[in-house]
C-alpha cells in the first residue's frame, strides 16, 4: 500500500503535505505530553514491529500492494495521535532507507496508513471496547480505512491527463482502485490485520497489562 514517487501529481503532493504538517505538529505535541520513561520502550518495540510487518508486501491488481500495518495496536495502547506519529516515522525510514514508498508521497502514505488507520481503529475500539471482538474489528477497520484513502487518491489521478486523454500519473481510475484495494483489504488484508492485532494484544495483556493500558493511566 506504500505509494511510490511518480504516482501522484504535484498538486496532490502539495495538498497532502499541507494537510499532514499541522497533524504531525499536533501529534508531536501529544507525544510530548504522554510519553515517559516507562512507555518509551513499549512504543519503540511496537513501532519496530510495525516496521517489520510492513516490509512484507503482497502485490495486488491495480498497480499497488497490500500488507499488515500494526497501527491499530499502537492506537489501542497509546491513542491515535501517538500511533499516527509513530507510524509516520516508520514510513519515513522505510521511504528514505529502503525506497519503500516515495518521499513525495510520504504525506499521503502517512495520512492513509498513519492517521486514517489510527483514528478509525481508536474510534472502533473505544466504542466497542467491552466486546470481545473490539480489538479484531479495530485492526480490520484500520486496514480498510487506510486502503480507502489510498484508493480514493490514486483513483482520481487519471483526471490529470494530457490532451489525448493519456494519464500523466497513476493510470487506473476509481473503478479499478476501489475494488482492487478496498475489496482486497476487506476480505483478506483487513482480516489478517485483525487477527494480528488480536493476538499481539493478547500477548501484551499477559506480559504487562499495566503497560498495555498506558494511555488510560
Question: What does each model-identified segment do?
Answer:
Residues 112-151:
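Short helix-perturbing small/polar motifs within transmembrane alpha-helices
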Residues 47-51, 82-95:
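Small-polar-interrupted transmembrane alpha-helices in polytopic inner-membrane proteins
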Amino acid at each position: 500500500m506504500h505509494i511510490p514517487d511518480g504516482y501522484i501529481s504535484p498538486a496532490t503532493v502539495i495538498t497532502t503535505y499541507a494537510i499532514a504538517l499541522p497533524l504531525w505538529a499536533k501529534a508531536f505535541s501529544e507525544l510530548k505530553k504522554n510519553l515517559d520513561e516507562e512507555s518509551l520502550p513499549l512504543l519503540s518495540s511496537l513501532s519496530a514491529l510495525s516496521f517489520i510487518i510492513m516490509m512484507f508486501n503482497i502485490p495486488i491488481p491495480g498497480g499497488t500492494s497490500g500488507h499488515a500495518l500494526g497501527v491499530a495496536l499502537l492506537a489501542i495502547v497509546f491513542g491515535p495521535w501517538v500511533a499516527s506519529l509513530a507510524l509516520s516515522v516508520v514510513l519515513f525510514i522505510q521511504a528514505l532507507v529502503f525506497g519503500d514508498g516515495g518521499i513525495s508521497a510520504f504525506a499521503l502514505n502517512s495520512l492513509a496508513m498513519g492517521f486514517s488507520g489510527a483514528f478509525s481503529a481508536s474510534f472502533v475500539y473505544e466504542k466497542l471496547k467491552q466486546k470481545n471482538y473490539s480489538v479484531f474489528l479495530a485492526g480490520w477497520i484500520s486496514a480498510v480505512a487506510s486502503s480507502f484513502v489510498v484508493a480514493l487518491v490514486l483513483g482520481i489521478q487519471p483526471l490529470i491527463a494530457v490532451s489525448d486523454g493519456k494519464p500523466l500519473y497513476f493510470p487506473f481510475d476509481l473503478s479499478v482502485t476501489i475494488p482492487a484495494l478496498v475489496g482486497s483489504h476487506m476480505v483478506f488484508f483487513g482480516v489478517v490485520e485483525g487477527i494480528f492485532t488480536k493476538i499481539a494484544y493478547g500477548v501484551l495483556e499477559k506480559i504487562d497489562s499495566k503497560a498495555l493500558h498506558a494511555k488510560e493511566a
